[in-house]
From Swiss-Prot:
S-adenosyl-L-methionine binds at residues 224, 253, 274, 321. PROSITE patterns: SAM_MT_RNA_M5U (PS51687), TRMA_1 (PS01230), TRMA_2 (PS01231). The active site is at 348 (nucleophile). PANTHER family: RNA M5U METHYLTRANSFERASE (PTHR11061), TRNA (URACIL(54)-C(5))-METHYLTRANSFERASE (PTHR11061:SF30). One of its GO terms (biological process) is rRNA base methylation. It is an enzyme of class 2 (transferase). Its EC number is 2.1.1.189. The gene is rlmC. It comes from Shewanella putrefaciens (strain CN-32 / ATCC BAA-453). This is 23S rRNA (uracil(747)-C(5))-methyltransferase RlmC. Belongs to the class I-like SAM-binding methyltransferase superfamily. RNA M5U methyltransferase family. RlmC subfamily. Catalyzes the formation of 5-methyl-uridine at position 747 (m5U747) in 23S rRNA.
Amino acid sequence: MSAVIVNTVEQCGYFNRGQCQSCRHIQVPMAQQLMAKSLELQQLLKPFVAPSAAIFYPPVTGEATAFRNKAKMVVLGAAHAPVLGIVSPSGEAVSLCDCLLYPSDMQKLLHRLTQFVQQAGIPPYRVDKAKGELKFILLTRSQVRGEYLLRFVLRSHNSIERIERALPTLLAEYPQINVVSVNIQPIHMAILEGGEEIFLTENTRLEERFNDVPLFIRPKSFFQTNPQVAAQLYQTAREWVAEFAPKSLWDLFCGVGGFGLHCATKDIALTGIEIEAEAISCAQISANLMGLEKVQFMALDSTDFAQGKNAADKPDLIIVNPPRRGIGEALCQSLSEFAPKAILYSSCNPKTLAKDLEHIQGYHLTKVQLFDLFPHTDHFEVLAMLVKD
């Protein structure tokens, strides 16, 4: 199901003042945004659609505001007057604590975190001088119980003690902050996080739940930022896959297992592949909670896995959910050679989806659906079902 598409325009003060241009289409009515995205998708996939062969289902949408579950805040200003937000096009430090994309409880917590930085006396990192400590605050919200994962990205270990001293007061005020960690990123470059993660709480993962499937978020594991539409994306994948009644299933670029765990049953042999070990750990915990025994998750490169000896047993159906770069020609060739009944391709970049479709041989599109996980931007997710000729 989709939310009713209202032909209204959201009013954002940040955008109107020229302080933030991230939602570049926020002044375009939602119905018009969806029409433009749908047209772009149809044009990109037109070369791969035989007449009357593929069905383009109506776009799936959610709320236009208060939908986002993750905030990535640059920490600016000074220790006595910190600012959580971005640097505007004019070079101004702009607080984004009241961004319309965040739920109201998240906005409130972001304001409290600004106060926390000030009270703890943590100096924000100054890019122009390569001095200071606190680079980013990353906040992730679970819709299950409104719990949070909070990360402080620091240049060094020097301010950890300041955070630890101030943390008990914050956690007493906000017991819904379930996980707190410090990430050390010492490099003077525009890199969001470093290799070292230090947990300041006993809990190390945040629970989320889509369609009664338990999923877990750790600091470095990828997770969809629009829970409402993501739940519909996973449910649609489950329904499309069930039509083929596969006995074996691969979930490549599986992340925390969202697609594979939605599609798996106790009778389906599921193999999930993901390069990030933290995500694989989360996926395995979910599988155990669901009582799935014919499941294996491995921290490997998906292309390397498909070309290696572990891929000897060919599955009935393959799911791919790659990053924006797509799956690449080598993996396209491997999928063509495996010749499963069907390939379910979830793409966050329709341009690379179209490029990959040029290299997947022996398949035709039967279903395509757009999921608008990123309102007011040019980005969207696509679910495409390819069936063996």
